[in-house]
Amino acid sequence: MSFTKIEQKLKEFTIDAGRYPSINTNEQLKELEMNIGNQLPSDYKDFLKKYGGCYLESKKTTDEIEYDVCYKPLEKDPWMGKGDDTQLLEGFYGLANDHNSLQKAIDTYSDRFPRNIIPIASSAGGNEICMDIDNGKILFWDHELSHPDKDFFLIANSFEEFVFSLVDEPIEADKEDDGILYIELDDDLLSS
């Protein structure tokens, strides 16, 4: 599938991307691939060139209902509830040398990830969305686990498949957030 189809899918969302006209994306990608010792998939490279480090926002959000951009993974991770079929996407890392720097994210996790796995985006709770650069698969990394062979869960078989799994998900209000203050009293307090 061509990058054009990925671009079409991404038009479903508002893309908040930092613009850095002084960045030579081809040079940055060349340096990045040299650092990781492998080629990135072409659709992911095209994504980095066009959007860089970015956040996706739902176009469905209204005054009444707020939406998050989520993905539907192939394999559930420990952070998903029993009835959940989506997980939150926070933001993608990019080529600029800023807080969304892909190279900085790779460096940060180099001692926790196998050599062939790099972070490409952040997920809720300090978890990461990663790419296995040997096969292009997209994985969820659970930051609370400490067994490299068990810390990763399959999201998608390719970057393209990952992008096509993105959906708008309404943010559920807390069930107890009904404007009523609940107070629990200990029985010992009541008997004194």
Curated annotation (Swiss-Prot):
InterPro entries membership: Knr4/Smi1-like_dom (IPR018958), Knr4/Smi1-like_sf (IPR037883)
Superkingdom per UniProt: Bacteria
Protein name (Swiss-Prot/TrEMBL): SPbeta prophage-derived uncharacterized protein YokK
Organism: Bacillus subtilis (strain 168)
